[in-house]
Amino acid sequence: MESQSLCLIKNDIFQLLIQLSKEDTEIDIDFTRIILDKLLNTNGIQLAMASTILRFKNPNIYQIIDQRVYRFIYGEIMKEPYSIVTKIDFYIGYLEKLRDICDEYNLDFSLSDRQLYALDKKYNPDFKIKY
């Protein structure tokens, strides 16, 4: 029998997600903190999944946090913090750094997680990722 994981997202989180517009281009840090806190306090949702949900809602503001992209932009292995508050700060800092790199190198922020992931695979093929 195959094991399945189930994640139950409460209605208040859906209501917050509805408030995210695909047309927005500026991050609302306070709102982001609220929604990340709710997502990360949901059983089965870690930072990578929370960032994926946010990216799905608006890729112009949010990108998926990924070990390869992190390594490519910071030059070191990603060490995800333990506490939820620290994870939120970590992700917001990641987005700010990613935005700066996109501005500096004229990259489309909405595609940057995919582009930098591919660059890391190309230029760091011998460095394996721990899952």
Feature annotation, model-predicted:
Residues 1-38:
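Long, highly charged, low-complexity intrinsically disordered interaction regions
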Residues 56-62:
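Catalytic Zn2+-binding segment of zinc metalloproteases
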